[in-house]
Swiss-Prot record:
InterPro entries registered for this protein in UniProt: CCK-like, Gastrin/CCK, Gastrin/cholecystokinin_CS
Annotated SMART domains: GASTRIN
Protein name as annotated: Cholecystokinin A
Tissue: Brain, gastrointestinal tract and lung.
Keywords, alphabetical: Amidation, Cleavage on pair of basic residues, Hormone, Secreted, Signal, Sulfation
Disulfide-bond pairs as recorded: none
Post-translational events: The precursor is cleaved by proteases to produce a number of active cholecystokinins.
Pfam family, one: Gastrin
Residues the record lists as Phenylalanine amide modifications: F111
Length: 123
């Protein structure tokens, strides 16, 4: 329930920010767009002092955020009655009761569960 509310708030913030960016883009004139696109963009280099070109990845970031949200929502729908979901499918969840197939075989002596009737006395 709490995670659903957080997701809704996150989606609302993302949609509001994208609407704000769209309205700002509508205000900028075509001439300003041409001058901005002709200027080179530079990002700060590590410590070498060299300039390197900066590429905008706003569209990529938006699509990546969308993909992450879709995966989260799909996993939250698959969540069991406990409300837990698996972030990484190959990570085991240790609180689920399951048999250990490689170590649970006939003849295995589990002293904590054996009853007195099953124990054979040699007399």
């Amino acid at each position: 329930m709490y995670s659903g509310i957080c997701i809704c708030l996150l989606l609302a913030m993302l949609s509001a920010s994208s609407k704000a960016h769209q309205s700002e883009d509508a205000v900028v004139t075509e001439m300003d767009q041409l001058t901005l696109s002709q200027l080179p963009r530079y990002a700060r280099a590590s410590s070498a002092g060299q300039k390197k070109s900066f590429q905008r990845t706003d569209g990529d970031q938006r699509s990546n955020i969308g993909n992450v949200l879709v995966k989260y929502l799909q996993q939250s729908r698959k969540a069991g009655p406990s409300g837990r979901y698996v972030v990484l499918p190959n990570r085991p969840i240790f609180d689920q009761p399951h048999r250990i197939n490689d170590r649970d075989y006939m003849g295995w002596m589990d002293f904590g569960r054996r009853s007195a009737e099953e124990y054979e006395y040699s007399s």
